[in-house]
Design a protein with these regions (language model features):
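C-terminal catalytic domains of large/alpha subunits in multi-subunit enzymes
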Residues: 15-17
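Helix-start/capping segments and mature chain N-termini
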Residues: 21, 28-152
Length: 152
């Protein structure tokens, strides 16, 4: 970080986006496990994730498409997970929403996560966040909120 510290933004509403990723580099294609891989971390200065900055976002509950199911890759930061969410995201944006709120992939009634973040609710004085059951990325948002609430 010291070498590239000039790239770390310090203006209000900015941050350093960190994206690690891993991809297979085997010499042949096929239906087999990966034997060699490349691990890369991209660091990029960014502004607000949403066009409206730090203002609340308008979200829509997705009742048709499924982002992830238990036993799949939903709990991993996996590039393929984004493909499953594109259609619903495009519909949401076309209708004036910033994000999709995803429901479970089986019954379509239990809240799982937002398209770009975990979700944490305060309902009747109780803090509620979806359980990590294999289809939700265990992200820094919910972990940070839960730690803050525990410390209070």
């Amino acid at each position: 970080m010291k070498v590239d510290e000039r790239w770390v933004p310090s203006d209000p509403g900015t941050s350093l986006y960190i994206r690690p990723f891993l991809y297979g580099t085997d010499a042949k294609l096929g239906l087999h496990g990966v034997h060699t891989a490349q691990f890369i971390i991209i660091l990029s200065p960014v502004g607000s994730y949403f066009d409206n900055g730090m203002e609340p976002v308008k979200i829509i509950v997705e009742t048709e498409d499924v982002r992830a199911v238990r036993g799949g890759t939903g709990e991993a930061k996996c590039g393929g997970n984004y493909g499953a969410s594109n259609r619903a995201g495009e519909r949401a944006f076309a209708n004036g929403y910033s994000q999709v709120l995803w429901l479970d992939g089986v019954e379509h009634k239990y809240v799982e996560e937002g398209g770009g973040m975990n979700v944490v609710f305060k309902i009747n004085g109780r803090i509620i966040t979806p359980m990590l059951t294999g289809s939700i990325l265990p992200g820094v948002t919910s972990r940070s909120c839960l730690q803050l609430f525990e410390d209070w």
